[in-house]
């Protein structure tokens, strides 16, 4: 079981883009923004705002 877990160093976390959001989360926000809210849950405008705030 220990082999399944990877030790994450603080430097790795600091180098991640997105203020704590991962690439997959930012990609989901971008997709919601680009689709005008027709894909995924939530409105397009809120997704765009969150993407600009947390993923740029």
From Swiss-Prot:
Q: What is the effect of changing residue 40 to Q?
A: No effect on glycosylation
Prosegment location in residue numbers: 1-19
Q: Name one Pfam family in it.
A: Sublancin
Q: Which GO terms describe its cellular component?
A: extracellular region
Question: Which keywords does this chain's UniProt record carry?
Answer: Antibiotic, Antimicrobial, Bacteriocin, Disulfide bond, Glycoprotein, Secreted
What's any GO biological process attached to this entry? Answer: defense response to Gram-positive bacterium
Q: Give, from the UniProt record, the effect of changing residue 40 to E.
A: No effect on glycosylation
Which Cys pairs are S-S linked? 26-55, 33-48
**Highest taxon, organism lineage:** Bacteria
Which residues get glycosylated? 41
Disrupted gene: phenotype observed: Loss of bacteriocin sublancin 168 production, but not resistance to sublancin.
Q: Which InterPro entries match?
A: Glycopep_SunS
Q: How is it modified after translation?
A: Production of active sublancin-168 requires at least one thiol-disulfide oxidoreductase (BdbB or, in its absence, BdbC). Membrane translocation and cleavage of the precursor are probably performed by SunT.
Where, per UniProt, does this protein localize? Secreted
Subunit structure, as described in the record: Monomer.
In terms of NCBIfam families, this protein maps to: glycopep_SunS
Function, as annotated: Bacteriocin active against Gram-positive bacteria. Inhibits B.cereus spore outgrowth, after the germination stage, approximately 1000-fold better than it inhibits exponential growth of the same cells. Inhibits B.subtilis strain ATCC 6633.
Name this protein carries in UniProt: SPbeta prophage-derived bacteriocin sublancin-168
